[in-house]
UniProtKB/Swiss-Prot annotation:
This is Rab11 family-interacting protein 5. Residues 269-300, 342-402, 415-548 are annotated as: Disordered. Rab effector involved in protein trafficking from apical recycling endosomes to the apical plasma membrane. Involved in insulin granule exocytosis. May regulate V-ATPase intracellular transport in response to extracellular acidosis. The gene is RAB11FIP5. It is a peripheral membrane protein.
Length: 653
């Protein structure tokens, strides 16, 4: 055998060899009828065989000799099945000896049968097609009528014809991928009846060849059983059944395959369309569902804590940017907030409940984002609510002196107004830094009266400005918090200033507070005094420590006003208590903690402020995460157990 194989001629490099053959059984004509009666009919099906592979078509019931199937299947050719024929044709020497062994594998056998309910299926005819001859005629698709013959050794009769299409392919999908069943031994009549009584679906025993479009499969056994059930009414079954296993191998992912598979294996009833829809086609359910849910945001609308409102949710810009710019970013506000998966819809604006005691001094309207604008509009009214009354009574006797001092400082700092970085250079020609001293504005009795109120308002007020710092600049927040909390004797920053200088500083400060220009430009580098918060200790020590910080804040505010070019007229204040301020300023020997910041430059103060702001921002983020968690937990409780949130009725009075 090795010598014979060695004598094989080499195949031409340009010769095309198929690996599969695709057979399509279209129809038949002139078949013999097997049923009794005048109009003889038959339940015909065809068995297709190449080598040892067998496949069967569906059963066409009660056909009058002209059934139509239009079903196809594919067979894999054995290796070297057509090589001998090709080499013999190329050599013009006839069939080669090595081609005889593969001759049986190159024959297509078509056997037409009649499906009988009881007994063996009846033979209708058989046709044998030589595939090598068909392939020798060319690679094109061949459609031809083949005559049906009798079995070998039997008398030849007129059995009709069958039309078949043969197509050779290469590297095509095999029909075995469809789990097509082979035509094994014929079953006994009793096994068929037993299967039908049990209602068994015989997918493994009927044809699984592919169906061309616009065709339906009919169960061969169920077809004859339906005819018999008309008389007896016992074996009545559905006659037609579509199966995805009988689809063509050329339509693996087609719509007909998917719909047929879902229709035959899934529930057939109301709502079956939703059950059998493929995931790719049912994706519109989720998208449209999300669209519907987005259009109805009133499912869960609730307000969060006092730090923000449902209709004023915002995303705050970086706080370093607030320090450098000093104004609000209008694009950072938003009227809609998505907290996790919850949509906060816009609701009617109402009073907000705050956890601080300062809500009595501020207007109780929608949000605290417009605090600066309200302070600008109300002017003297907000000043009356914020500052001590003793300071208002003493702010009218030093207007002329304050105006002169502001004019002198404006002349000195005029070059610094054009360039913010030259403020330090503008102070050097004077030989000493600009220090502002503010006189005492209340007696010791007023300090004793407001000591208790200051302790109560200290924590809530700082908490309020901690959460709602966006509407005010940093210098204004520090100044208001420190002055609003202390409200007592204020000591100057330097013991070397005279009483006239103190009166000038005080009159210019309160004159600016009462006249409040809304168009005033902020300083390019607002600096917040770090010692504005109250310090633990005795009352005298607290007052002495906070005096320098207040003086520093007022001096920076005055410099900001001078550089911005908006000097407001001031009112004259009386000089009552001026000598007491001078004595306290000279007698104070306690070192203020804010003195350690005097040697720092403007840039160093800004960097220190930015560091503190980063720490506060981290704390705010943590608080916001906790608030979001509480909101999600509340919504989850509302969804799962809303009865937990119901207030039980109180006892009858």
């Amino acid at each position: 055998m090795a010598l014979v194989r060695g004598a094989e001629p080499a195949a031409g490099p340009s010769r095309w060899l198929p690996t599969h053959v695709q057979v399509t059984v279209l129809r038949a004509r002139g078949l013999r009828g097997k049923s009794s009666g005048a109009g003889s009919t038959s339940d015909a099906y065809t068995v297709i065989q190449v080598g040892r592979e067998k496949y069967s078509t569906s059963v066409v019931e009660k056909t009058h000799g002209c059934p139509e199937w239009r079903e196809e299947c594919s067979f894999e050719l054995p290796p070297g099945a057509l090589d001998g024929l090709l080499r013999a044709q190329e050599a013009d020497a006839g069939p080669a000896p090595w081609a005889a062994s593969s001759a049986a594998a190159c024959e297509l056998v078509l056997t037409t049968m009649h499906r009988s309910l009881i007994g063996v299926d009846k033979f209708l005819g058989q046709a044998t097609v030589a595939l090598d001859e068909v392939f020798g005629a060319g690679r094109a698709q061949h459609t031809q009528w083949y005559k049906l013959h009798s079995k070998p050794g039997k008398k030849e009769k007129e059995r009709g014809e069958i039309e078949v299409t043969i197509q050779f392919t290469r590297n095509n999908l095999s029909a075995s991928m469809f789990d097509l069943s082979m035509k094994d031994k014929p079953r006994s009549p009793f096994s068929k009846i037993r299967d039908k009584m049990k209602g068994k679906k015989k997918y493994d025993l009927e044809s699984a060849s592919a169906i061309l479009p616009s065709s339906a499969i009919e169960d061969p056994d169920l077809g004859s059983l339906g005819k018999m059930g008309k008389a007896k009414g016992f074996f009545l079954r559905n006659k037609l059944r579509k199966s995805s296993l009988t689809q063509s191998n050329t339509s693996l992912g087609s719509d007909s395959t998917l719909s047929s598979a879902s229709g035959s294996l899934a529930y057939q009833g109301p709502g079956a369309e939703l059950l059998t829809r493929s995931p790719s086609r049912s994706s519109w359910l989720s998208t449209e569902g999300g669209r519907d849910s987005a259009q109805s945001p009133k499912l869960f609308t609730h307000k969060r804590t006092y730090s923000d409102e449902a209709n004023q949710m915002r995303v705050a810009p970086p706080r370093a940017l607030l320090d450098l710019q000093g104004h609000l970013d209008a694009a950072s506000r938003s009227s809609l907030c998505v907290n996790g998966s919850h949509i906060y819809n816009e609701e009617p604006q109402g009073p907000v409940r705050h956890r601080s005691s300062i809500s009595g001094s501020l207007p109780s309207s929608g949000s605290l984002q417009a605090v600066s604008s309200r302070f600008s509009e109300e002017g003297p009214r907000s000043t009356d609510d914020t500052w001590p009354r003793g300071s208002r009574s003493n702010s009218s006797s030093e207007a002329v002196l304050g105006q002169e001092e502001l004019s002198a400082q404006a002349k000195v700092l005029a070059p610094g107004a054009s360039h913010p970085g030259e403020e330090e250079g503008a102070r050097l020609p004077e030989g000493k830094p600009v220090q502002v001293a503010t006189p005492i504005v209340a007696s010791s009795e007023a300090v004793a009266e407001k000591e208790g109120a200051r302790k109560e308002e200290r924590k809530p007020r700082m908490g309020l400005f901690h959460h709602h710092h966006q509407g005010l600049s940093r210098s204004e927040l520090g100044r208001r918090s420190s002055l609003g909390e202390k409200g007592g004797p204020i000591l100057g920053a330097s013991p070397h200033h005279s009483s006239s200088g103190e009166e000038k500083a005080k009159s210019s400060w309160f004159g600016l507070r009462e006249a409040k220009d809304p168009t005033q430009k902020p300083s390019p580098h607002p600096v917040k005094p770090l010692s504005a918060a109250p310090v633990e200790g005795s009352p005298d020590r607290k007052q002495s420590r906070s005096s320098l910080s207040i003086a520093l804040s007022s001096g920076l505010e005055k410099l900001k006003t001078v550089t911005s070019g908006s000097i407001q007229p001031v009112t004259q204040a009386p000089q009552a208590g001026q000598m007491v301020d001078t004595k306290r300023l000279k007698d104070s020997a306690v070192l203020d903690q804010s003195a350690k910041y005097y040697h720092l430059t403007h840039d160093e103060l800004i960097s220190l402020l930015l560091q503190r702001e980063r720490e506060l921002s981290q704390r705010d983020e943590h608080v916001q995460e906790l608030e979001s968690y509480i909101d999600r937990l509340l919504v989850r409780i509302m969804e799962t157990s809303p009865t937990l949130l119901q207030i039980p009725p109180g006892p009858p009075k």
